[in-house]
Amino acid sequence: MNDVTTAGTSAKITVDPDDFTFVHYETGQIVDVVSELGGLLGMGNPVHVIVDETTPAAKLSAGVDGTSSDAQVTIHAQSGALDDFQRLTHFGADNARQSLGRMMLRARDRMRADFADAPADLDLSLRQNAAWDAYCAGRLARAGVPMSEQRWRYNYRNRFGFSDAVDADFDRLWAADDLGWHDLGAD
């Protein structure tokens, strides 16, 4: 496990594995992205990123071991979530920012009392996942991370339907900053 405390932040960022053999990633690339996101999102929590480099799938999950500002955030990422879309098996900083940023926001949400009822990431329904992704992606966009609103709108429509009412609900999630779990409307 590579253990790094980055300059300008007190957050301890660790990455597993230390050395990648199936994908062309450097641990430092992941540390840099997580450190940058920590600054953008105002998160100083220690973060542990575990990358499954044996699959090109893009599944992500995040967990947190408490509700304090020093609670450990653990992110599990299949390597496809961090790949450069133009050069698969190579690190893509933009894709990593979007993927890891969504998981960091989920972890930050989970530290709030109004997210206490949220299921673990791997237990979320497709609708719950789509709603939370829309909420996180909108916040990332406002923080300065380039996000494709249309991509997340389409993902949301695929789970909730194609209608003006569904689009209005997506717009509400995309523009929101302080929703609780039950406000996401995907129960």
Pin down the residues of each PLM region.
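Auxiliary, metal-adjacent structural segments of Zn-dependent hydrolase domains
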Residues: N2-G80, G138-R139, A143-V145
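Pan-zinc metallopeptidase signature
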Residues: R159-D187
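Hydrophobic/aromatic-lined pockets within catalytic cores
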Residues: D109-A113, L140-V145, D178
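Post-HExxH zinc-binding segment in Zn-dependent metallohydrolases
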Residues: A120-N155
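Short pre-active-site segment immediately N-terminal to the catalytic Zn-binding motif
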Residues: A81-S99
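N-terminal, positively charged nucleic-acid-binding surface of large information/translation enzymes
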Residues: L88, D117-A118
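Active-site recognition of the HExxH zinc-binding catalytic motif
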Residues: D94-F115
